[in-house]
Amino acid sequence: MAQIDFSAEIRALRATYSSIENVSNVEELKEDIAELSERAGEPNLWDDPAAAQKITSRLSHRQSELERLNTLVSRIDDLEVLVELGQDEDDADSMGEAAAELESIRKSLKDLEVVTLLSGEFDEREAVVTIRAGAGGVDAADFAEMLLRMYLRWAERHGYPTTIMDTSYAEEAGLKSATFEVNAPYAYGTLSVEAGTHRLVRISPFDNQGRRQTSFAAVEVIPLIEQTDSIDIPDNEIRVDVFRSSGPGGQSVNTTDSAVRLTHIPTGTVVSMQNEKSQLQNRAAALRVLQSRLLLLKKEQEDAEKKAFAGDVKASWGDQMRSYVLNPYQMVKDLRTEHEVGNTSAVFDGEIDDFIDAGIRWRTDNRNAAN
């Protein structure tokens, strides 16, 4: 094992922590927690359930932020003590434990540093993710299903609850589309950098001649609407269609017309839901996602108007944001950040944190440059 200069490393940890602490504004965070705690303790809090939910959720988020900061500084202090004991007693086991903890704290600081970059209006929100198969036939449908598994595994690794809201199966294999929620703080801010067109290059398992196939899938990420958001859609602006839920291969999985498709007529926005048991539940879920999409659309339009004054009306990540090449070599590469990984199996198993972190930093740099 290479010799580690623990004194220098611990100084570096404290410097990184200090910069994060400054950005997080701990005193303001504590004041926010005190104010929210006072409001959460009011006897008439639940007279307005929607407002109460927002207050308690925000309080939980703020308390978690402060706890993460306090835990990290304690871990750095404990590491310093462990190193001193290990060096005084010339204990190889203690020094090995210290080396492992050093690496773990570095990772925790890196994760927290990325969270401090999530300062967008909706970044704290939970997320709704939709994956759609693009060009490439059955390979594109299979790719869409691979991406669904990748994001669900990513969420599982982080302990984030997920809810699959809708799945539309392709006839031969894979998915035409899938929609799911990630029910965790900052899920939208984190996953929004995954939005865009993903490209897969591989030898097609569905081609009898074993030819190489390029296929595409689109990923959409929107913030989950909260009950206190003012998004009212007049009934005459929504067209409602009902149909039977379908499973793999196009087979019907329900004998009643429980699936629901909502179309927002002014914008052409379409949302389908079929995973709930009743038409009423599917309609409520579809309406929630439709409201979320319209909320984001409104924000994007406002941002575009502001950017137009500065001569910048670009409002997308571009078409192809990441390539997954499985043949003739193995490489996953983000075309915006240039970050790349050769272990494609690990990526498809949900190990995408480095891609997300690089994407968030790239987005922050672009925003700062624009300002």
Curated annotation (Swiss-Prot):
Keywords: Cytoplasm, Methylation, Protein biosynthesis. This is Peptide chain release factor 2. It is found in: Cytoplasm. The keyword Protein biosynthesis applies. Peptide chain release factor 2 directs the termination of translation in response to the peptide chain termination codons UGA and UAA. The modification N5-methylglutamine is found at Q251. One of its GO terms (cellular component) is cytoplasm. GO terms for molecular function: translation release factor activity, codon specific. Belongs to the prokaryotic/mitochondrial release factor family. Methylated by PrmC. Methylation increases the termination efficiency of RF2. Its main location: cytoplasm. The keyword Ligase does not apply.
